[in-house]
Amino acid sequence: MSQSTGFSSKLLNAGKINNKGIEAQLGITPVKKAFTWDVDFNFAANRSRVIELDAEKLLTNYVVATNSAQVIATVGQPYGSLFGTAFLRDGNGNIIVNATGAPATNPTKQVLGKYTPDWIGGVYNTFSYKGISLGVLVDASFGGSIYNGTYATGTYTGVLASTLPGRAAEYGGISYYYPGNDKANGTVRVNGTAPTGVTVYDDGIIFDGVTADGKRNEKILPAQQYYKTFRNIDEANIFDASYVKLREVKLSYNLPAKWLRPLSLQGVSVSLVGRNLWIIHRNTVDIDPEVAFNTGNGQGLESLSNPSTRSYGINLNVKF
């Protein structure tokens, strides 16, 4: 179309996604006396697949959101697939290193996971006795992946505790030197005594990989160079997004009916509530995996997010 028309783009309601899922709820009362115990379970799972992106089938993929890794809708893949740079591997799955001993990057972006969980669920326990009730909610999300941008940046800058190994001899660092004190000559491991006049460093790390010809890597990298490598390889910063949380604890008291009759009230209850109290289990490091999941398209991509917060409150419910 000629540029003279002024037309540049058009928004379309396009694309087809196939979703198949299940949702179930179950409530039981194990104890029903003066003391009552109620338990409510819920479970949900969904499987999606992108069928098409446009009616003319001109598109095979579409970038939904980007950080370093990207969320790309691709025909044949689950919606929410994460794509990014990955380690270069041989036929046996071993990571291949380059001439310096650093991990090599696959020239083609790879599917690194999907941000949608395999399943989610929760258990709500309510314990009641003589007008006092205690509610405890534990919920969980299992499966799915997250790009941890905080980990990527923290590893690159060396501010995380996970970058401590290898930074000095007392932390497992390997001693090495540069022949002639020229870094262009590459690193050489100190075996016994180093040559006279060279500077010896003790922050060496050997990446666990193989050379292009399949031999075990023996090249030493300075710790700083070693840790900086991973920022540019998205696969190194992909984590399992599963978690289990103590989501809510609520302690309630229902005022006796005899106190309410003079006020013509049907019921009054006072509750103390705490939310997001404890991450019981998570597979991410340094962040709450939930911070990367919102209502937008950029789910599964996290970058230097603020910590999640606990909240406490008082509820007053009055029935007239």
Role assignments for model-derived ranges:
Residues 34-35, 131-136, 258-259:
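Repeated loop/turn-to-beta-strand initiation elements of outer-membrane beta-barrel proteins
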Residues 39-45, 127, 136-140, 170, ...:
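Transmembrane beta-barrel strands of outer-membrane/channel proteins
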Residues 41, 113-130, 139, 234-255, ...:
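Outer-membrane beta-barrel transmembrane strands
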